[in-house]
Amino acid sequence: MSFFNFRKIFKLGSEKKKKQYEHVKRDLNPEEFWETIGELGDGAFGKVYKAQNKETNVLAAAKVIDTKSEEELEDYMVEIDILASCDHPNIVKLLDAFYYENNLWILIEFCAGGAVDAVMLELERPLTESQIQVVCKQTLEALNYLHDNKIIHRDLKAGNILFTLDGDIKLADFGVSAKNTRTIQRRDSFIGTPYWMAPEVVMCETSKDRPYDYKADVWSLGITLIEMAEIEPPHHELNPMRVLLKIAKSEPPTLAQPSRWSSNFKDFLKKCLEKNVDARWTTSQLLQHPFVTIDSNKPIRELIAEAKAEVTEEVEDGKEEDDDEEIENSLPIPTNKRASSDLSIASSEEDKLSQNACILESVSEKTEHNASGDKFSTKVLNEKPCPGEPENAVELVGGAVAVLPDRATELPESGREEKRPKLDRLPDTEDQEMADINSVSEGEEDHAVTSETNIEHNLKPEKERDQEKQPVLENKLVKSEDTTIQTVDLVSQETGEKEVDIHILDSEVVHAVEDTHEKLRKDDTTQKDVISDTSSVGERDEEIGAVPKTAESSAEGAQGDGGKETDEGAQILISKATEGPKASGTEEAPPVTEITETNDTDQKLVENTHEKQLPISSETTLDTSEGLGASEGREVTESGSTEEVEVEGAVSETDEEDVQSETRGAPMAVTQMDTEKNETPHEAPAQVEVQVPVPPQPSEPPPAPIPSININSEAAENKGEMGASLNTETILLPESESQKENDTDSGTGSTADNSSIDLNLSISSFLSKTKDNGSISLQETRRQKKTLKKTRKFIVDGVEVSVTTSKIVTDSDSKTEELRFLRRQELRELRFLQKEEQRAQQQLNGKLQQQREQIFRRFEQEMMSKKRQYDQEIENLEKQQKQTIERLEQEHTNRLRDEAKRIKGEQEKELSKFQNILKNRKKEVLNEVEKAPKDLRKELMKRRKEELAQSQHVQEQDFVQKQQQELDGSLKKIIQQQKAELANIERECLNNKQQLMRAREAAIWELEERHLQEKHQLLKQQLKDQYFMQRHQLLKRHEKETEQMQRYNQRLIEELKNRQTQERARLPKIQRSEAKTRMAMFKKSLRINSTATPDQDRDKIKQFSAQEEKRQKNERMAQHQKHENQMRDLQLQCEANVRELHQLQNEKCHLLVEHETQKLKELDEEHSQELKEWREKLRPRKKTLEEEFARKLQEQEVFFKMTGESECLNPSTQSRISKFYPIPSLHSTGS
């Protein structure tokens, strides 16, 4: 076995080397350096702990993330790199990072103030505008720094903005942030939290054509500002996935009540929430906006001090009452007259419910309450109850008769809208005043304070609100420089009663009212309401002085003490309308908060455990402008908590009994109303005074009369409807004669004037409409009610402040927490999904990039290989040609040498023969000379020798020259032959070389075309892969969305089942109590009108009992039918929701397929265009190549021609060959 196989078996050296990161310490135990001292929370990807450095004692927030692999570890490197690279006072700093035992520890700067959303939840109210300004400016500076460093945060929200104890903010959570490499780089990832996503980010879910840049953070900033102003972001009532469609298609969100906020704030939001990205301002531009010119962070320091204050909690149980206490003696109440146009019109279902309920003959009185909380009024019938009137539960509270509306049989929203009185829309400048008495909007947490002798808070059951599916509405707090307006407007949807608590105060004008929880248990009902305006100090004083004449004397007691305290600067009572966080369909009970600011010399705390209530008796009608309550959708009165701030100086605490004695029987102070002059006349009087005495009961001490309610209509100007505009100095209070009522339960609209009614018939009406087949009774509510009292003590700028918050604790609180937890779970699931999608997208992008690199590398290799192949062939051809030429030249040289030798040999022989002939001739001359005489012989010999020598020399030269010419001719002929042969070979070689070059170019062109095709196919396949992943991710999101929808629907069904079970269980008890009460009252009426004999009375009683049994049976059947209808409607609604969801999902899938088809088509068109352009460029390339070949061929021909001619110009010139083989001349020959 080889060593390499051995290594494979034991995996020696095969382990992948761990990647080292710059800011992450590996294989070091973080617990050796940091001590965990507590848990801060549970994030989407792991727990967050509070840690302390063992050496420096520096605190840190340690995020511990379980990472299974190196690939998962890389997902968090972007966050760590961004944190490490950022150095800004408003961005959290990275203190340390460890990777130990598959856990990634990220230790960041600890911010003790907590997140903005957590502070709002803790204090149960949104931020004020000054606080928002501070947060906004510092957040803008942080964003501007990030954007300058090419970083997009992509998850900006209140939960990611942290407070420090110094009153500054730190931007955190860069888990989904993007770090670009270029300034103008854009992104196309669908990532972030839906509620805060910019429209261009939302569009990336189905289309990557329009990527986004840094301005996506600016949109998120605008949404975050709305979140801080209203506790929840816009569209928070929607599912996290479904809100995306809302963002993409609807107009940019705005503040729910713009009039409560400054114009700078609204303009700033407008600049942030601009759907057109090009028109949206950048962070640097926004920093120049006047909204963020604030320099001090004092508002945040006060906020943090309050949020981090010491909290003392106290739970008070509500008193229990027996069922028998419901039965009250008749009250001497004057009868009311009813207008002929106010006849009740009941729905068909209510006809069936109450057809047997009209037993007693006379006028009945009914206080109805709008189901949406927008209006309520008192209705009086001058005939016996019609069969169509709803059967509503009635409680006798403090002598007043209240009728419980039928919550289960509400009309649909459109029906409510049609029945409401059409009220004039108030201008924005008067929204503050109108908001003070605006009704609680739909789905809001309504409260009533009611009992036998006092008024207590009564909460509507959470389940009924869920059933109604009313939108969750938010509260807004308005704060100007020197005036704070806070309002509490409470409606009990159980009793139809509405209590209005209005406190408008500034630093100079104060009206204090006390109503402690103990007073609610006193014999007399004491109620006060303080009303002031939002104008300047002088205007307020004038307005407060404008109390109706009939109420002045009794109002003095209520206002006198408050005025005294104001003059002395001792006590300030501020009622702040705040709101607890609300999940979809749920709200929290608004607690009453009291802030007591005491100086060092006097540390007295005045408790105010309940809101001041405006009693709504049977003669009063309260209505409000629908334009504010319904259309605006959010009211100050929808708060989850109400704070009353009381600052005490050296004034002693007012005794509760004194306050009671002063306020007992005193009317409520009411400001005058300025109404429009063109209102229609009404038959009701201009001023109405109502007194409802309460007779003593056997089980209780004799109660005092209910305080009179004086309403001045200001010379009967308010004669028509109530929706007239108000000026900025007034606060509208209800006038019973001008109100119209919309009863959503029975479809009945009626008005009542302020005449007296007959109690017997009122009770009869009450009994005929009682409890609406199982609605929660007041006694049940009182038994379930607990009051949670929180007291916060903290110091702001050396002044100790105490805040007391009283909140009624019901099941709705836990339900709210549960729904908020479920919503967080949904967001967490979405975050996980996004993280998985991002990882999968990164993996796919890496894979596709690798594929592109591989194919381009292959293209290059193929091209180089093809070129190398043809270059090699051309080189071989040239080498072969060279060798051939060299061989031929060698052959030609050898042949020429041989031929020259041969000719030379022949010429030498001929020359030798010629020389022999010359010798013979010389001999002959010698012989001839010898024959001459001797004396002449010597001279003749000499002369004849000279002649012979000359002639022979000339002959020999001629002979040699002739031989040379013959030799040159022969060699020339041979050379020409060789030249022709070489030219042919060169031409053939050039042709072969050009053919190879043509083949090379053709192969290159073919390769280029094939590469274009392959590149197109690859890009097409990659595009399909990308869209396949998008479809897969979209389907996963749809599955998650469907799963969440099914869970939501299942919760609704379960809640409805539980509520129906409770109603079925309550109905027999209610019926028994009713039967007992009705029988007692029937017998009492028989005793009063005792004209018949005892037998006749017994028969009437039997008949009444039979009718009661029949009525109860009908009630049970009606309840059963109602429950079936409710379940059927709910199931239909759930099915409709699922269908709508599937339709939206199909639209998204269809849109994605359309985008894919469009992109594929564009890709094909691009390929066709590219191919066309390539082919167009190919023709000139071919032409250029052929021209080059022709030029080279011509050059070769000219070369060979010129060479041949140059050598033939001088025939006597020796050739290159003959030069080396000279013919011997006469000088070289022997003689």
UniProtKB/Swiss-Prot annotation:
Question: Which residues are annotated as modified residue Phosphothreonine in the UniProt record?
Answer: T183, T810, T1093
Q: Pro residues compositional bias: what residue ranges?
A: 693-706
- Predominant location of this chain? cytoplasm
| Compartments, record wording | Cytoplasm
Q: What class of enzyme is it?
A: transferase
**What tissue expression does the UniProt record report for this protein?**
Ubiquitously expressed.
Keyword Cell division among record annotations: no
Q: Which residues form the UVR domain?
A: 871-906
Q: Where is the composition biased (Low complexity)?
A: 683-692
Q: Which residue intervals are annotated with compositional bias (Acidic residues) in the record?
A: 312-328, 641-660
Active site as annotated = D155
- What cellular component GO annotations does this protein have? cell leading edge; cytoplasm; perinuclear region of cytoplasm
Pfam families membership: Pkinase (PF00069), PKK (PF12474)
Q: Which reactions appear under catalytic activity for this entry? A: L-seryl-[protein] + ATP = O-phospho-L-seryl-[protein] + ADP + H(+); L-threonyl-[protein] + ATP = O-phospho-L-threonyl-[protein] + ADP + H(+)
Q: Which residues form the Protein kinase domain?
A: 34-292
Phosphoserine modified-residue sites: 14, 189, 330, 340-341, 344, 347-348, 354, 372, 507, 536, 554, 641, 661, 775, 814
Site feature: Cleavage? D431, Q432
Q: Where is this region: Disordered?
A: 309-351, 405-478, 516-757
Function in brief: Mediates apoptosis and actin stress fiber dissolution.
Protein family: Belongs to the protein kinase superfamily. STE Ser/Thr protein kinase family. STE20 subfamily.
The molecule here is called: STE20-like serine/threonine-protein kinase
Gene source species: Cavia porcellus
